[in-house]
């Protein structure tokens, strides 16, 4: 009985690690697909690109002209 429980626990842990690794790889692939980014005051579109570079976020105060704005370290 202990052997069965141990085997189930080990299987669960192995599955959890495999799932975490595949999620991380998927996120890396998604980030790679985003392509080049645009800087401050450049036109952007979070849903389809172009995307803002790291340190900026896309704001749509005057839709459809969305621009990248500095996130000020948020």
Swiss-Prot record:
Residue ranges listed under propeptide: 21-34
Entry similarity comment: Belongs to the neurotoxin 07 (Beta/delta-agtx) family. 03 (aga-4) subfamily. Aga sub-subfamily.
Residue positions where Asparagine amide is found in the record: 72
A Gene Ontology cellular-component term: extracellular region
Domain notes: The presence of a 'disulfide through disulfide knot' structurally defines this protein as a knottin.
Pfam (any one): Toxin_7
Tissue expr: Expressed by the venom gland.
Protein name as annotated: U3-agatoxin-Ao1f
InterPro entries (alphabetical): Beta/delta-agatoxin_fam
Keyword Metal-binding: no
Highest taxon above the source species: Eukaryota
Principal subcellular localization: secreted
Swiss-Prot/TrEMBL keywords: Amidation, Disulfide bond, Ion channel impairing toxin, Knottin, Neurotoxin, Secreted, Signal, Toxin, Voltage-gated sodium channel impairing toxin
Disulfide bond residue pairs: 37-53, 44-58, 52-68, 60-66
Function text: Insecticidal neurotoxin that modulates the insect Nav channel (DmNaV1/tipE (para/tipE)) in a unique manner, with both the activation and inactivation processes being affected. The voltage dependence of activation is shifted toward more hyperpolarized potentials (analogous to site 4 toxins) and a non-inactivating persistent sodium current is induced (site 3-like action). Interestingly, both effects take place in a voltage-dependent manner, producing a bell-shaped curve between -80 and 0 mV. In vivo, induces an irreversible spastic paralysis when injected into insects.
GO molecular function, one term: sodium channel regulator activity
Subcellular location: Secreted
